[in-house]
């Protein structure tokens, strides 16, 4: 499994075309539940360019891009505590899976 991080949107992208394995949706739902980020399929126009997409296609293993924070990049450091709290559960759960 791979977790990649970007800074924009408070959303988790989990799918790449039809390559993600069956358990990917269930794991993504768990990540969404512990973070309160929405779980969404990767928009077509955003596909084909990310490490997550390459990983899913080549290894047929779950992969997730987690978009943290809101606003104009670079995000202000004042968002750090919220981003940390929102993502701690994902990191712990990801390590246990």
Residue map of PLM features:
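Metallocarboxypeptidase
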Residues: 1-97
